[in-house]
Amino acid sequence: MSEKKNMVETETPPKPTDRRSHNCGPVLEARSVAFAFPHAGKPVFEGLSFEAHAGTMTAILGNNGAGKSTLLNLLASITTPSAGEIYVSGESLQSMNKRETAQHIAYVTQQQRIPHLSVYDEVLLGRKPHVSWSISEHDRTVVATALKQLELEPFVDRYCDELSGGERQKVYIARAIAQQTEALLLDEPTSALDPKNQKEVLQVVRDITTQTSRATVMVIHDVNLALRFCDRFVLMRNGTVVAQGGIEAVTDEALSETYDMPMRIAEIGNVRLAIPTAS
């Protein structure tokens, strides 16, 4: 097991903050945001507004090139809007440094670096991103819980680069969960998982979202998985929000415009499904 668990403190980490109980507004909010890549002739977004509330899972849906991952990068402060403001728990992201942002937002991207760390140490990074910080019993408990929730206990001493793509994806999600931030961003969190693991992982994320009152926002291509696990939806096409809101926002018309093909919502038993239809 890792030697990090026996380290002594040489630097005092910032105390964790939790403003969810003090703020009745959205956890994440974009207000009239515009963004353009350098030297691009056309902006990706103009006047985009968006909200994510505590205890809800929001799916960002759309074809490739719709602007979904760009929106996540803006919400995570990876990129900066050219106009408008983005807030987390009522505070402007633009006023925060990287450390402060990481106290509020955990982000699992599609392109994760794979340091030569054990699974345990990788998840521990969610608690202690600096090796000079001490590790408390609470930290160990949080890490152990995240490992158990993602069924990673058999792999704790394995190196991440020895794992399959799906197993690594679960490690990164566990690390983000261990951060215990009020916002969790996931870019295609199930892309490397088989159908069984997709549902199991999304159920874990769903349970954690509701139990800890986090705001979870994820980009996902599978509309039917989104309909099954998410509360709110943002449907995007070419940088424009076609529709957003609860399940009532996912209409036949909105889906058809978002995916540029005829689609309809069907109810089979208690399950809602998005089905392509003949034109």
What do these predicted ranges mean?
Residues 76:
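Helix-to-loop junction immediately C-terminal to a conserved catalytic motif
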Residues 184-188:
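Catalytic Walker B motif of ABC-type/P-loop ATPase nucleotide-binding domains
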Residues 17-30, 34-47, 97:
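A short, flexible loop at the N-terminus of ABC-type nucleotide-binding domains that lies
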Residues 137-155, 180:
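Conserved ABC ATPase "signature" region
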